[in-house]
């Protein structure tokens, strides 16, 4: 506990415990003294208590604030604390000693702390003094006691300080320094009587100041004995202690004579004067004149004049070395000899007391000062300073020697002079209506002392502080010291407003203990002032008192709260800040014995009494009718004791020899004149006087202290004769008689035994009687009231208990919460019922309930002792216990055991079926079992479950590890795990999974062994299936790595084979490509391909085409495992393929004969009718649109423009499904296949394909080895040599053409150009007619990627359009594709001999040789399917040889292998065809044909790209340069639509005419074309589905390239130039073959479709036309100009 540290400094303050706080109700608050009497048993244990009034009780502040002026007291905080004041007194004496010695006291600092000289002195004295400590070397221990750490040389330092400062003072105190010097008769330890200090002439420092060194202390010297003027109040006239409550000794209320006042005044000395005095300088030696006059008072010699000192007080001389202790040097200041020092120090000190401040304050000015001080001190607003901080700082300051804080306290201000804070009806001020309640309230401190129950009401005089309240105006740190109230009365304090007041209280039973502790800790103060604690000037830290066993309690009194102190309860405290409080004393009936004890205590201390206690008792007894009954009873008791004591004292005095007696009315004698001279007690009943001094008297307790005269001369003065005392006692007794009777009856009733107990009704009557007669609420009254209350409570509880028991039996399942009695409470209740001082009727029934409870207890104990809980038995007991409305302790236990029993039943049921015992079930059972109360059966089951769970989890974890192990565990190790876990009676999923994995592993191994033991290798699909199934099996399969390696090798071989055969993004599988075709006759691609197979076969059957459905070879290979069967199936599919191809070729060739139904015949893979430019597949003989299939590419582009003779053969994408590698590549794949221990359907298909290809190769070689075919091959070789020569000539012509172009730019050679041009043109035409055809290749643009096309054909897909469009420039073919051509480009593919035909190159060469300069005109025809008369072929073969070659060619084309023999046979067969035979169709569309989307090209193609395309077309078709020269004359690119059957000369003439005519209209059309650009763009987007149709070549449509097709001019004289989305044309059937807009000639589309049209010119030539329908036209065409041409035109 905190207190004072070793060095005298205060440690941190620890607040004591809080005192009780009471909050009375309004009913309790109506009677203050009764309420205080009720709380007294509890509150008096702590000495103080706090009472909070009801919230609505708020009395107004009634003081006149403006006129309220007061002078406060000055308080130095560190002088209040007892131990601190002792230290300060010691330092004062020490400083005074050294000042008289001519030195200034300077307190040293040790280890950065001021040395506590007082503590050092006490510690050294306790250890035997300076010599003993030095001798025994205990200075280090002294340092430890002072709180210094050892080992730093502190001991020696302390020794030097003690020897220098304290040791001389110690010698002086012991009297050694005065040995040999004659001294007057002085007692250095003479005690000083306490002195009454005058306060009206003292000056004080300003409040709130702080000093950091030694504080200044004001001292007064006593000059005369205590005397003073008193008021004329008869009771206070002779008192020396003025009033009760927190007050200070010596504050005289009267005035003094001026002479006494002046005499008592003394000069104020200040403790720091000793430090601040300016000492006059003394010379080290005396002058020569004085040497003979002064000698040393010790040695009597005058030598050593330089060491001879002269006293400044008495002028005596002393040698420095004769002094004790000797002085080392001559003092510089004033020096006094030991005799003068002893005289000065022996003067009595003035008693300590508070000074009055100089300044007078109002409440406002004092509040401003107080608030400024607190806010400045704590450096924060006053309301924000915590009370705990102020409390700790206060106790730190009062214990601090270094800091001196001065505050002011407006204490003991009489409300009689300044007015009370409560409203009072004293006539000074008018009471407002709202103040009336508070003016009459018993809690008004002006009313409380004079209440009917109060003893002080019988004192007629206003005792200031006891009957008249005192006011207290406090500030921060202002305090009131430890004290008890006068006559040990009650006190009550009310805080009107302001900051809290902190209180500390000590109960009355520890009052003497507190006094002893303070005497022990500060004996110096009590030596001079024995009644120090009655002077309110000394405080001590509560922590110090608590350390010494004194109980201390605290509280913070806030505004509007009361604090009550009880008799002889020491209390002290301080203010937290600016506040205003009011206090007064009061005495109740229970105080009378305490007051009597207080007078006896005062008698021992010789302390004055405020009033005579005996007088008060007899005054109340003189008028008993006005006494309260309770007070009368107490007065009767006190009066009886006093009568007995007074009789004893008088008898003892008479026995001592006092003979004279005389009656005297003591109440008429002033109190100061009837005080006992020995004990100062105020005498009332009797006193002893002597004739030698009639004014002097003593009480009968001190008869011998009166005077030395004999007792016979002394006279006994008495107030009442002994004979009159019984009569007074009888009057009081009569008043209290009724009360005594009531007391006896109540006592008898409360103490009666069981058989003689009263009924509850009788006790109620006694209580009502006491309340009606207002008997005092003493212990008996409270006991009766408590007994009645207890009996009533027990009766109501018993009735409630019995009634609820019945209700509970009727509704035991009610869920409402009820408060039940426990068994112990029931037993105690039954015991209480039978121990009541009265009888209640329900006691017996409650006893029966207790018997039922005990029976339940016995049965429950038996049930709980069972080895295994029985759920049915437990349930029955629970039902029984629930019916009793008692809190049975066994009931929760029974419910627990019921839960245990049900849990055990569940465990037994679960374990009976191992399949239900999963880990989760066991965990749930364990979790539910963990929450159960402990039981050996449950614990046993829990242990079994836990063990089973642990084992199961361990095996489950082991199985899980095995399942997830990498690498996998072997079968044997897993089987051992499964076998070991088989005996566990639980459901283990991982173990079962492991078991299943073992089963799968066995099955898998068996399958592998079965496959490996077979005669043939397994198929890849089988091994892949085994690998896929074996891989997830969590068992180490020995054969799995081998199987996976085989699968990987087989897959690698299949991927390599696929790269060899398959095109990129091919829709065919490798097995389909390697197997004979089963989809012959099936068209389409993608996912619908297989679906269309069956649908097309059904359609072909409906058309009576003999196409036998073919099965899938792949399915046959998968179903067949025998090698021989595979070969047989392949042969069977091969035969079906050949038959199906024969049927398909026949069906496709038959389409060409269906001229009348040509619109219904479907061609191409798109399965649409014939239209535009079409190509015929050499294998299936079907025709394909050039926009649906990729066009064949010249092989010369791949081989650097070589003119090697190779054919251009077109195979459709359906017939040519793969890359067709060479046989050498296939043989390397077969070698790799032989190394694989795996069967692949693709491998077997490849073997069969290879055997088929080699077999065909053998047949082909045999056929080519015949004489007829050998000679044909030789003839072709000769023609090939001619082609090489022709290529050389063509190169020469190119050089000549280039030179001509250069010459055209030279003006000097312009005249010679026509001849050169005509000559060059003729040579070019002849050379082109004899040039060999270039070989063509093809690919499938729907299935091949750009990269694949580049790899296979040598051109990009971006160039496909140009390649396609190249075919449209053949003059002898029908073509509706367009190629834009600029006039600046050299074009060599127009108006030449047909070169893009399916002829062998040798036939072309032969044809050029056989043809003359002019070519016979083709036969005019309306249908492109009508055969023309052809020229003779190059080779002639026999029908048998040709048929054999055609059959070999068909079979060879079916093979997906490239063989040289197919090229040889193809060349021979091409040479057998006529040179002009068409293998490409150009169909003119009518409106009934399906329109195809228009491919619009933008203008973003560069000129270089266009030129490259045209050069490729030139290389592809080998056309002459004469056409290019003519085209160079044209300004814009042109597209020509050439009609089959017109001869070249006629076409050229018409073209020349058209060019001249169009040149003239060119400029006019440019403006119109520009205006129509945007309109044509929109119409082009809307009509993308429309197809471009062919226009007869005799029209020159060069102007159309510059304008819109819709604005083209027809042959009509007044052409309207129709501007529509679709322009319909009609051709004249009269012979001129001119073309006309249907709108311009007035022909509707229906007429043009059903009738022949003859123009006006032809009609004139033919004469009048007979009426009737015109012959139907051949074709009606719809034309739309391509967007690219339009852009170029614009």
Curated annotation (Swiss-Prot):
A zinc finger (PHD-type) spans 293-343, 1161-1218, 1607-1661. It comes from the Eukaryota. The modification Phosphothreonine is found at residue 1343. InterPro entries: ARID_dom (IPR001606), ARID_dom_sf (IPR036431), JmjC_dom (IPR003347), JmjN (IPR003349), KDM5_C-hel (IPR048615), KDM5A_ARID (IPR047974), KDM5A_PHD1 (IPR047973), KDM5A_PHD2 (IPR047970). A zinc finger (C5HC2) spans 676-728. The inhibitors KDOAM-25, CPI-455 and others inhibits its demethylase activity, resulting to cell growth arrest in cancer cells. SMART domains: ARID, BRIGHT, JmjC, JmjN, PHD. This is Lysine-specific demethylase 5A. The keyword GTP-binding does not apply. One of its GO terms (molecular function) is zinc ion binding. Disulfide bonds: none annotated. It comes from Homo sapiens (Human). Coiled coil: none annotated.
């Amino acid at each position: 506990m905190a207190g004072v540290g070793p060095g005298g400094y205060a440690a941190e303050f620890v607040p004591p415990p809080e005192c009780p706080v009471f909050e009375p109700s309004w009913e309790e608050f109506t009677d203050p003294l009764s309420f205080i009497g009720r709380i007294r048993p509890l509150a008096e244990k702590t000495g103080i208590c706090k009472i909070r009034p009801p919230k609505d009780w708020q009395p107004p502040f009634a003081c006149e604030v403006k006129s309220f002026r007061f002078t406060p007291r000055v308080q130095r905080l560190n002088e209040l604390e007892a131990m601190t004041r002792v230290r300060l007194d010691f330092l004062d004496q020490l400083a005074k000693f050294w000042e008289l010695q001519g030195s200034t006291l300077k307190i040293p600092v040790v280890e950065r702390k001021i040395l506590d000289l007082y503590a050092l002195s006490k510690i050294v004295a306790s250890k035997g003094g300076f010599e003993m400590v030095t001798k025994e070397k205990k200075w280090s221990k002294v340092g430890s006691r002072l709180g210094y750490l050892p080992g730093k040389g502190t001991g020696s330092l302390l020794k030097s300080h003690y020897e220098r400062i304290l040791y001389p003072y110690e010698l002086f105190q012991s009297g050694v320094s005065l040995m040999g010097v004659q001294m007057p008769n002085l007692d250095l330890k003479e005690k000083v009587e306490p002195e009454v200090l005058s306060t009206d002439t003292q000056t004080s420092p300003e409040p709130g100041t702080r000093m950091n060194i030694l504080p200044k202390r004001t001292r007064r010297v006593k000059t005369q004995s205590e005397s003073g003027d008193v008021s004329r109040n008869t009771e206070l006239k002779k008192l020396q202690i003025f009033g009760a409550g927190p007050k200070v000794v010596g504050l005289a209320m009267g005035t003094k004579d001026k002479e006494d006042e002046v005499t008592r005044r003394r000069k104020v000395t200040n403790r720091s004067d000793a430090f601040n005095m300016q000492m006059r300088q003394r010379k080290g030696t005396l002058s020569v004149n004085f040497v003979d006059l002064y000698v040393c008072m010790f040695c009597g010699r005058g030598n050593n004049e330089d060491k001879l000192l002269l006293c400044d007080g008495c002028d005596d001389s002393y040698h420095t070395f004769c002094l004790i202790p000797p002085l080392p040097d001559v003092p510089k200041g004033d020096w006094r000899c030991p005799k003068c020092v002893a005289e000065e120090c022996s003067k009595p000190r003035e008693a300590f007391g508070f000074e009055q401040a100089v300044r007078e304050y109002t409440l406002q000015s004092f509040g401003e000062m107080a608030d400024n001080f607190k806010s400045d001190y704590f450096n924060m607003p006053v309301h924000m300073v915590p009370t705990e901080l102020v409390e700790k700082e206060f106790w730190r300051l009062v214990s601090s020697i270094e800091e001196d804080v001065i505050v002011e306290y407006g204490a003991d201000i009489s409300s009689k002079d300044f007015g009370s804070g409560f409203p009072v009806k004293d006539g000074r001020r008018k009471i407002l209506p709202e103040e009336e309640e508070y003016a009459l309230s018993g809690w008004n401190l002006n009313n409380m002392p004079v209440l009917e129950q109060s003893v002080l009401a019988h004192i007629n005089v206003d005792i200031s502080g006891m009957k008249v309240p005192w006011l207290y105006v406090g500030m921060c740190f202002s305090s009131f010291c430890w004290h008890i109230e006068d006559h040990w009365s009650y006190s009550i304090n009310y805080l009107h407003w302001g900051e809290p007041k902190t209180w500390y209280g000590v109960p009355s039973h520890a009052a003497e203990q507190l006094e002893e502790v303070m005497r022990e800790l500060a004996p110096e103060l009590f030596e001079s002032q024995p009644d120090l604690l009655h002077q309110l000037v000394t405080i001590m830290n509560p922590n110090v008192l608590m350390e010494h066993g004194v109980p201390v309690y605290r509280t913070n009194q806030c505004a509007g709260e009361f604090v009550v102190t009880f008799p002889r309860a020491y209390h002290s405290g301080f203010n937290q800040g600016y506040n205003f409080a009011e206090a007064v004393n009061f005495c109740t009936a229970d105080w009378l014995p305490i007051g009597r004890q207080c007078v006896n205590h005062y008698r021992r201390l010789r302390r004055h009494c405020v009033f005579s206690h005996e007088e008060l008792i007899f005054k109340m007894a003189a008028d008993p009718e006005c006494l309260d009954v309770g007070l009368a009873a107490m007065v009767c008791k006190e009066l009886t004791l006093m009568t007995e004591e007074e009789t004893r004292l008088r008898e003892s005095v008479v026995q001592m020899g006092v003979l004279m007696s005389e009656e005297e009315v003591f109440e008429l004698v002033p109190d100061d004149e009837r005080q006992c001279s020995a004990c100062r007690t105020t005498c009332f009943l009797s006193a002893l006087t002597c004739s030698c001094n009639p004014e002097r008297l003593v009480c009968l307790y001190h008869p011998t202290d009166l005077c030395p005269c004999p007792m016979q001369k002394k006279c006994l003065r008495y107030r009442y004769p002994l004979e009159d005392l019984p009569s007074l006692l009888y009057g009081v007794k009569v008043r209290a008689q009724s009360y005594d009777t009531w007391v006896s009856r109540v006592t008898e009733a409360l103490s009666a035994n069981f058989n003689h107990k009263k009924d509850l009704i009788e006790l109620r009557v006694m209580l009502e009687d006491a309340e009606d007669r207002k008997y005092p609420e003493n212990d008996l009254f409270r006991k009766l009231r408590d007994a009645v209350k207890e009996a009533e409570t027990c009766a109501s509880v018993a009735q409630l208990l019995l009634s609820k028991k019945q209700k509970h039996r009727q509704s035991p399942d009610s869920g409402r919460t009820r408060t039940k009695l426990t068994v112990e409470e029931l037993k105690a209740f039954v015991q209480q019922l039978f121990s009541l001082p009265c009888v209640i009727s329900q006691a017996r029934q409650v006893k029966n309930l207790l018997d039922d409870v005990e029976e339940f207890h016995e049965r429950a104990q038996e049930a709980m002792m069972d080895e295994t809980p029985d759920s049915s038995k437990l349930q029955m007991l629970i039902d029984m216990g629930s019916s009793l409305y008692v809190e049975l302790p066994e009931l929760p236990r029974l419910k627990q055991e019921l839960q245990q029993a049900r849990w055990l039943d569940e465990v037994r049921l679960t374990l009976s079926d191992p399949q239900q015992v999963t880990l989760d079930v066991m965990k749930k059972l364990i979790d539910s079992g963990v929450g159960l109360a402990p039981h050996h059966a449950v614990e046993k089951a829990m242990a079994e479950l836990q063990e089973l769970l642990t084992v199961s989890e361990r095996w489950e974890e082991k199985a899980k590890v095995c399942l997830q192990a990498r690498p996998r565990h072997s079968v044997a190790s897993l089987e051992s795990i499964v076998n070991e876990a088989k005996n566990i009676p639980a459901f283990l999923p991982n173990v079962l999974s492991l078991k299943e994995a073992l089963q799968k592993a066995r099955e898998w191994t068996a399958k592998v062994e079965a496959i490996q033991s077979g005669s043939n290798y397994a198929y890849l699909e089988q091994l892949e299936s085994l690998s896929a199934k074996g891989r997830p099996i969590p068992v180490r399969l020995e054969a799995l790595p081998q199987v996976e390696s085989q699968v990987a090798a087989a897959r690698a071989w299949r991927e390599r084979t696929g790269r060899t055969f398959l095109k990129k993004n091919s829709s065919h599988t490798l097995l389909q490509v390697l197997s004979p075709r089963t989809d012959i006759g099936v068209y389409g691609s993608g996912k619908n391909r297989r679906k269309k197979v069956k649908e097309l076969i059904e359609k072909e059957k409906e058309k009576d085409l003999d196409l036998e459905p073919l099965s899938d070879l792949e399915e046959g290979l998968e179903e067949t495992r025998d090698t021989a069967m595979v070969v047989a199936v392949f042969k069977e599919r091969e035969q079906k393929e050949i038959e199906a191809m024969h049927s398909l070729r026949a069906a496709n060739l038959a389409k060409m004969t269906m001229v009348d139904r040509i619109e219904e015949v479907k061609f191409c893979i798109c399965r649409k009718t014939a239209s535009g430019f079409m190509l015929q597949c050499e294998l299936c003989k079907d025709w394909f649109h050039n926009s649906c299939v990729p066009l064949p590419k010249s092989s010369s582009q791949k081989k650097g423009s070589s003119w090697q003779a190779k054919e251009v053969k077109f195979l459709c994408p359906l017939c040519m499904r793969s890359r067709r590698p060479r046989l050498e590549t296939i043989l390397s794949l077969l070698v790799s296949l032989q190394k694989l221990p795996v069967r692949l359907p693709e491998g077997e298909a490849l073997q069969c394909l290879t055997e088929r290809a080699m077999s065909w190769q053998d047949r082909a070689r045999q056929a080519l080895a015949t004489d007829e075919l050998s000679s044909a091959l030789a003839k072709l070789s000769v023609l090939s040599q001619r082609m090489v020569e022709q290529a050389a000539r063509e190169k020469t012509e190119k050089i000549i053409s280039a030179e001509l172009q250069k010459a055209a730019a030279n003006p000097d050679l312009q005249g010679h150009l026509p001849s050169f041009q005509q000559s060059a043109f003729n040579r070019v035409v002849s050379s082109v007619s004899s040039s060999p055809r270039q070989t063509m290749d093809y690919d499938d643009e729907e299935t091949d990627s750009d990269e694949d096309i580049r790899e296979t054909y040598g051109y990009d897909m971006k160039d496909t359009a140009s390649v396609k469009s190249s075919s449209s420039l053949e003059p002898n073919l029908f073509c509706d594709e367009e190629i834009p051509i600029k006039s600046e480009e050299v074009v060599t593919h127009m108006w030449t001999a047909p070169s893009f035909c399916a002829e062998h190159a040798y036939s072309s060469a032969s044809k050029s040789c056989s043809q003359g300069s002019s070519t016979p005109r083709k036969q005019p025809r309306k249908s492109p399917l009508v055969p023309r008369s052809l020229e003779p072929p190059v080779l002639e073969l026999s029908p048998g040889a040709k048929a054999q070659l055609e059959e070999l060619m068909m079979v060879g084309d079916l093979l997906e292998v490239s063989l040289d023999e197919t090229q040889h046979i193809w060349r021979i067969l091409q040479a057998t065809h006529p040179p002009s035979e068409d293998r490409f169709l150009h169909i003119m569309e009518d409106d009934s044909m399906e329109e195809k989307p228009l491919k619009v090209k933008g203008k973003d193609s560069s000129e270089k790209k266009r030129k490259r395309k045209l050069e490729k077309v030139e290389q592809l078709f080998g056309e002459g340069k004469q056409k290019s020269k003519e085209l160079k004359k044209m300004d814009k690119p042109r597209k020509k639509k050439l009609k089959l059957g017109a001869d070249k000369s006629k076409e050229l003439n018409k073209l020349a005419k058209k060019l001249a005519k169009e040149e003239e209209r060119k400029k006019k059309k440019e403006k119109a074309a520009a205006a129509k650009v945007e309109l044509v763009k929109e119409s082009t987007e809307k009509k993308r589905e429309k197809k471009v149709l062919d226009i007869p070549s005799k029209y020159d449509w060069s102007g159309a390239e510059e304008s819109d097709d819709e604005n083209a001019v027809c042959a009509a004289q007044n052409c309207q130039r129709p501007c529509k989305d679709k322009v319909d044309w009609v051709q004249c059937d009269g012979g001129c073959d001119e073309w006309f807009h249907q709108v311009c000639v007035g022909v509707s589309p229906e007429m043009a479709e059903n009738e022949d049209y003859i123009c006006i010119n032809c009609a004139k030539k033919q004469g009048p036309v007979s009426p009737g329908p015109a012959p139907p036209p051949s074709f009606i065409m719809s034309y739309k100009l391509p967007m690219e041409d339009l852009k170029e035109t614009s």
